Amino acid sequence: MVKVIASSVRKGNVLDVDGKLYVVLTAQNFHPGKGTPVTQVDMRRIVDGVKVSERWRTTEQVERAFVEDVSFQYLYEDGEGFHFMNPGNYDQVVVDVETMGDQKAYLQEGMSCILSIHEGIPLALELPRHVTLEITETEPVVKGQTASSSYKPAMLSNGVRTMVPPHINAGTRVVIATEDNSYVERAKD
């Protein structure tokens, strides 16, 4: 365990609070006009998945657990959870549905991901920044509709909705940012 000041806590960090491990979901520093600056942290308890919010003074000490970030390859999903393999030593790890969260929509067989592991237990998953998916359906473009936004809604092959430019049609492969489901560019393949 390492003691750090609260203002240095970031999303994905693992904190030890009162002997229990938590994964940080969001961390924001607030500097009010009067009073001391504070750090608002939303966390998920690793043992049971309960979400907790904490507020600390930015200079307060918190304990950050040692977490190892290891590259893994996604294999498949079954009743147990999501199976990943370490390409270096062929060890397999199962990640449960709660740990995956909304990221499961972007998993593709053979995809390389970074797993944060604490004492052999996978705590968090980091996907590649961009993935290539196919547009399954999109609305037709209305000619002359330039006064409004130039993007239109579209459904991706993984079931996620996003906004794409008017020239993108169903069947087109596009690059999507996994962090916020936004369109990046048309796929070059």
Swiss-Prot record:
Gene3D superfamilies: 2.30.30.30, Nucleic acid-binding proteins
InterPro entries reported for this sequence: Elong-fact-P_C (IPR015365), NA-bd_OB-fold (IPR012340), Rib_uL2_dom2 (IPR014722), Transl_elong_fac_P/YeiP (IPR020599), Transl_elong_KOW-like (IPR013185), Transl_elong_P/YeiP_cen (IPR001059), Transl_elong_P/YeiP_CS (IPR013852), Transl_elongation_fac_P (IPR011768)
CDD domains linked to this entry: S1_EF-P_repeat_1 (cd04470), S1_EF-P_repeat_2 (cd05794)
UniProt keyword annotations, A-Z: Cytoplasm, Elongation factor, Protein biosynthesis
SMART domains: EFP, Elong-fact-P_C
Main location: cytoplasm
Family classification: Belongs to the elongation factor P family.
Function: Involved in peptide bond synthesis. Stimulates efficient translation and peptide-bond synthesis on native or reconstituted 70S ribosomes in vitro. Probably functions indirectly by altering the affinity of the ribosome for aminoacyl-tRNA, thus increasing their reactivity as acceptors for peptidyl transferase.
Protein name (database record): Elongation factor P
Organism: Rhizobium leguminosarum bv. trifolii (strain WSM2304)
Name of the coding gene: efp
